[in-house]
Amino acid sequence: MARVKRGVIARRRHKKILKLAKGYYGARSRVFRVAKQAVIKAGQYAYRDRRQRKRQFRALWIARINAGARQNGLSYSRLIAGLKKAAIEIDRKVLADLAVNEKAAFTAIVEKAKASLA
């Protein structure tokens, strides 16, 4: 049986990791052992932050809606309760966009929510 050395496979593995580490600072982009750790950690951060992004955007939308609602004399929670009572189904992403870019439309929605609460 012939002796099989792993040079080709090792090079392929190293190249794959170093390609993923391209753009990293210093040894993290040049030294395989360090690059491998950096790539693994980057993957962990990416996995975690894909989930955090959803939470962070929802929090941002709520903050924007709350600011817009308070300009119209209503708190965020009262606005959402009013929208539910009025059977207006607009998600927070769209509401936040309206609060920032279409103030007149947002004010009209707030007035409908107020009317359903009264």
From Swiss-Prot:
The keyword Membrane does not apply. Keywords: Ribonucleoprotein, Ribosomal protein, RNA-binding, rRNA-binding. InterPro entries: Ribosomal_bL20 (IPR005813), RIBOSOMAL_L20_CS (IPR049946), Ribosomal_protein_bL20_C (IPR035566). The lineage of its organism: Bacteria, Pseudomonadati, Pseudomonadota, Gammaproteobacteria, Pseudomonadales. One of its GO terms (cellular component) is ribosome. This is Large ribosomal subunit protein bL20. GO terms for molecular function: rRNA binding; structural constituent of ribosome. Gene3D superfamilies: 6.10.160.10, Ribosomal protein L20 (1.10.1900.20). Binds directly to 23S ribosomal RNA and is necessary for the in vitro assembly process of the 50S ribosomal subunit. It is not involved in the protein synthesizing functions of that subunit. The gene is rplT. CDD domains: Ribosomal_L20. Disulfide bonds: none annotated.
